[in-house]
């Protein structure tokens, strides 16, 4: 059982089968496969969530999980990786914003927003805020590290889960995620 698998955002096929809501459970598989080595992996997968369908969210999406485990990995390393992703993907004009959040598998947890293609003029994609959330992230929770075989007194790490559709929307100035699936 994964701590974020709750009834309100999950598609249950039957009482024993659930569709994947995110790629985070892949962290444990990666840790158990690569222990005791440091890890830097990307884990892609298709995900499903019981969500309202809007210009910015769909019930199905592809997610990329990033996981780094090593000695002295810090939150600033995660923020640097996300900033570098934004610069490489969009150029130096794209801004990122970090907000505190909560996820049961990271501590502390953050959400990463990127400045919208509307250039703060307001649009339906960003709900006229000028920002679009693109990733949930944080430092890997000590319990998750332990479950993966890593001693949290020695090892630290960060993880992020990023859908591929929202960055594509920003890259190509598309104003509705539903164009990908409908």
Feature annotation, model-predicted:
Residues 1-182:
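TRNA-recognition modules of translation machinery and tRNA-sensing kinases, especially anticodon-binding
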């Amino acid at each position: 059982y994964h701590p974020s698998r709750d009834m309100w955002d999950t598609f249950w096929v039957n009482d024993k089968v659930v569709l994947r809501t995110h790629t985070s459970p892949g962290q444990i598989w990666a840790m158990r496969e690569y222990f005791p080595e440091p890890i830097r992996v990307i884990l892609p997968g298709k995900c499903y969530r019981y969500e309202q369908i809007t210009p910015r969210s769909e019930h199905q999406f592809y997610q990329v999980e990033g996981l780094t485990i090593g000695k002295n990995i810090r939150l600033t390393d995660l923020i640097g990786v996300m900033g570098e992703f934004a610069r490489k993907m969009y150029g130096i004009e794209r801004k990122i914003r970090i907000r505190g959040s909560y996820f049961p598998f990271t501590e502390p947890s953050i959400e990463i927003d990127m400045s919208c293609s509307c250039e703060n003029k307001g649009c339906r994609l960003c709900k006229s805020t000028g920002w679009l959330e693109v990733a949930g992230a944080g430092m890997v929770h000590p319990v998750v590290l332990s479950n993966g075989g890593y001693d949290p007194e020695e090892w630290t790490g960060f993880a992020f889960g990023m859908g591929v559709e929202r960055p594509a929307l920003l890259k190509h100035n598309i104003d509705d995620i539903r164009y990908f699936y409908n």
